[in-house]
Amino acid sequence: MVNSESHQSTSFLHTENIARSTAEIEYHPLRPFLPDNCKVLFLGSFPPQRKRWCMDFYYPNFINDHWRIEGLIFFGDKDYFVDKVNKTFRLERIIPFLEEQGIGFYDTNTAVRRLQDNASDKFLETVEPTNVSALLELIPQCRVVVTTGEKATQILCQHFNISKLPSVGQAISIPNVYSEK
């Protein structure tokens, strides 16, 4: 979980995972970002290599349009989260926005093997899938899980034993993942 008052000094890096990564296997370099009021969880497949990052947070590649799309949807300005001068994204705007909206981020893979030197899902081999049920237990207010690609969707469906992958834009129900307390 994150504390909104300390976000500017918070590191989102998962230093233990970074330290145990090898040339062969990469462990997830970021901690799950799960605001206390998380209602929507975005799940990608895995971050790009750190050499492609412009910030230590989700969707860190400056050529990726995720933060531009969020800016356009929520603020009518594709550059709302963009620092053009420094070619990075504005974490000082992103974090409070996500906390206010209750939007969380993580990925469907906890460890991967890159089959080529790039960020393409096509060349990611799952070594350790994320325990999505355990992740959702941490955010009981979550009502929507959004996957951001085919590989993330496949892994999520495998986790919940859903045999038919949804088409793009289609919503499906996943089993109740919250423990009865």
Residue ranges and their predicted role:
Residues 1-13:
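Intrinsically disordered, charged low-complexity linkers and terminal tails
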Residues 11-144, 150-167, 181:
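A polyanion-binding, active-site-adjacent surface
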Residues 166-178:
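Domain-level recognition of soluble alpha/beta enzyme cores
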